[in-house]
Amino acid sequence: MVTTKSKVFEYAVEIDRGGRMTVPGGAQIDRAEGWSPDHLLLAALVRCSIDSLTYHARRTGHTVSASGSAQGTVTRRETDGRYALVQADVRIDAQLEPRAAGSAELAAKAERDCFVGASLTVVPRYEWHVS
C-alpha cells in the first residue's frame, strides 16, 4: 500500500520592538495605527479567501479581480469562559475573466481550502458575489 505524504507549508514572521512586522528575507510592514491583532486576523481571513478563490479560478483558466471585507465578534465563549472570536462574517466581491458558469463551486472550494478559515474554532459565514 502506498502512503501519500501531505505537503508541509511553514511560515515565520518577526515583530520588532517598534511593532514592525517582517517576513524573514522579505518586506517589512510598519505598525499601522488602529490595527489590533484582531483586525490582522480578519484581514488574513479575507486575504486567504481571495487567494484560495484565485488559485481555483486560475486552475480553470480564469483571472480574478477581487476585494473583500470581514467583521468579527469577540466575546466570552459559553463553552469555556475564554474570550475568543465567536462570529466571523466575510464578504468577497470577485470578477472572473472569462465569466464562469460554476462560480458557486469555485466559492465552495475557496471556503474549503482557505487554511485561515479552516484553522478557526468558529466557522466563518461567507457571502460571495462572483460575476
Regions found by a protein language model. Name each.
Residues M1-V46, I50-S131:
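Extended beta-strand/beta-hairpin segments
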